[in-house]
Amino acid sequence: MATVKVTLVKSLIGRLANHKACVKGLGLRRIGHTVEVQDTPENRGMINKAHYLLRVEG
């Protein structure tokens, strides 16, 4: 299955709890942290919800 690189580029301070949960669900911990996740509808939904905090490649 295809993968997508996701990087946290903005802080989670003061963000909505749902958006923080999505970022945590993707496995991101700190600004600049990059993870490679599978390109599934579930992960795409989390990326779309918190898109303004992330950089997505691939």
Swiss-Prot record:
<dbReference type="GO" id="GO:0006412">
    <property type="term" value="P:translation"/>
</dbReference>
<dbReference type="GO" id="GO:0003735">
    <property type="term" value="F:structural constituent of ribosome"/>
</dbReference>
<dbReference type="InterPro" id="IPR036919">
    <property type="entry name" value="Ribo_uL30_ferredoxin-like_sf"/>
</dbReference>
<dbReference type="InterPro" id="IPR005996">
    <property type="entry name" value="Ribosomal_uL30_bac-type"/>
</dbReference>
<keyword id="KW-0687">Ribonucleoprotein</keyword>
<dbReference type="InterPro" id="IPR016082">
    <property type="entry name" value="Ribosomal_uL30_ferredoxin-like"/>
</dbReference>
<comment type="subunit">
    <text>Part of the 50S ribosomal subunit.</text>
</comment>
<comment type="similarity">
    <text>Belongs to the universal ribosomal protein uL30 family.</text>
</comment>
<keyword id="KW-0689">Ribosomal protein</keyword>
<dbReference type="GO" id="GO:0022625">
    <property type="term" value="C:cytosolic large ribosomal subunit"/>
</dbReference>
<protein>
    <recommendedName>
        <fullName>Large ribosomal subunit protein uL30</fullName>
    </recommendedName>
</protein>
<dbReference type="Pfam" id="PF00327">
    <property type="entry name" value="Ribosomal_L30"/>
</dbReference>
